[in-house]
Amino acid sequence: MINIRKSHPLMKIVNNAFIDLPAPSNISSWWNFGSLLGICLILQILTGLFLAMHYTSDTTTAFSSVTHICRDVNYGWIIRYMHANGASMFFICLYMHVGRGMYYGSYTFLETWNIGVILLFTVMATAFMGYVLPWGQMSFWGATVITNLLSAIPYIGTSLVEWIWGGFSVDKATLTRFFAFHFILPFIITALAMVHLLFLHETGSNNPTGISSNMDKIPFHPYYTIKDILGALLLILTLMLLVLFAPDLLGDPDNYTPANPLNTPPHIKPEWYFLFAYAILRSIPNKLGGVLALVLSILILILMPLLHVSKQRSMMFRPLSQCLFWILAADLLTLTWIGGQPVEHPYIIIGQLASIMYFLIILVLMPVTSMIENNFLKR
């Protein structure tokens, strides 16, 4: 008799995706981040669901409802901090996952890559709206500053901002709609992640060499299930260390002050995972130019397949490209640091140079280096 996991209509889908899936025999720990992102998403949806049971999306009670969750709800504090720090873990895994795709040339799977970029935008939008919900000072002013950027769009900008706000400033209508969107988007992300996986399984996984692994596949279970469990344990360990020992390490102290439209915080800045994009935005003195640079800093990922001129898919055997990749990683860390600093003399020029470097490396230096490496192959 045929095994039920291979015959049952539902079990068959799970089996083909997670059990009998043929996987390359040489994929490294950099391939763990896909499953870790899945775990992060499930964790965020569950903790978010329990938080939504006690949260009220009204400007007068939002801040106190979060306080109530932390003080009066059974284990509310741990749920709240798991959700807040879970977002940080989510973005760490996201950036590692994207970096892996860039390093090993996974962007040549066009559909998978493009849906991945859409996923990145959706997760960023969700995280931004989630940051507004506690209605602290940084929530309010962060929402005001970021939504205001849309006013840079010619002709329709001002109307668009007022339409998003639901009034003439960030207020009750804004908070209510942000809560609604923050609740629905993770389910859209789940659907997109399934499509992402569907397209990936059409081609099969890439591997560190970038060479086809069709002649050397192994079943996903038990080899990669056990490997993913190790990754998951490390993820949960890191998350719980953050939650239990330093829950506010990655947050902003200003968000423990209730939102006050009459009092602007000295330094308005988003969560740490958006600081690199915020630094790029601030490095351009023109408002519209800054907004375009901000969007392009992420949208540039769509161009990765077009900018790939190398004869080799992966960077594994391309030392010059490897150097450039790690310079890019260091540049992103520099931008993250600059994004959290005040707008004053050495930080302004450092931010501008780091922003120029970011676009220069991706758009010019990487393709040129690839061409030089192609020449090495001829000799």
Curated annotation (Swiss-Prot):
Pfam families: Cytochrom_B_C, Cytochrome_B. Heme b b566 binds at H97, H196. GO terms for molecular function: metal ion binding; ubiquinol-cytochrome-c reductase activity. The chain crosses the membrane at residues 33-53, 77-98, 113-133, 178-198, 226-246, 288-308, 320-340, 347-367. One of its GO terms (biological process) is mitochondrial electron transport, ubiquinol to cytochrome c. It comes from the Eukaryota. It is found in: Mitochondrion inner membrane. Its main location: mitochondrion. Its cofactor is heme b. Binds 2 heme b groups non-covalently. Heme b b562 binds at H83, H182. GO terms for cellular component: mitochondrial inner membrane; respiratory chain complex III. It is a multi-pass membrane protein. Keywords: Electron transport, Heme, Iron, Membrane, Metal-binding, Mitochondrion, Mitochondrion inner membrane, Respiratory chain, Transmembrane, Transmembrane helix, Transport, Ubiquinone. A ubiquinone binds at H201. Belongs to the cytochrome b family. PANTHER family: CYTOCHROME B. The cytochrome bc1 complex contains 11 subunits: 3 respiratory subunits (MT-CYB, CYC1 and UQCRFS1), 2 core proteins (UQCRC1 and UQCRC2) and 6 low-molecular weight proteins (UQCRH/QCR6, UQCRB/QCR7, UQCRQ/QCR8, UQCR10/QCR9, UQCR11/QCR10 and a cleavage product of UQCRFS1). This cytochrome bc1 complex then forms a dimer. Heme 1 (or BL or b562) is low-potential and absorbs at about 562 nm, and heme 2 (or BH or b566) is high-potential and absorbs at about 566 nm. Component of the ubiquinol-cytochrome c reductase complex (complex III or cytochrome b-c1 complex) that is part of the mitochondrial respiratory chain. The b-c1 complex mediates electron transfer from ubiquinol to cytochrome c. Contributes to the generation of a proton gradient across the mitochondrial membrane that is then used for ATP synthesis. This is Cytochrome b. The lineage of its organism: Eukaryota, Metazoa, Chordata, Craniata, Vertebrata. The gene is MT-CYB.
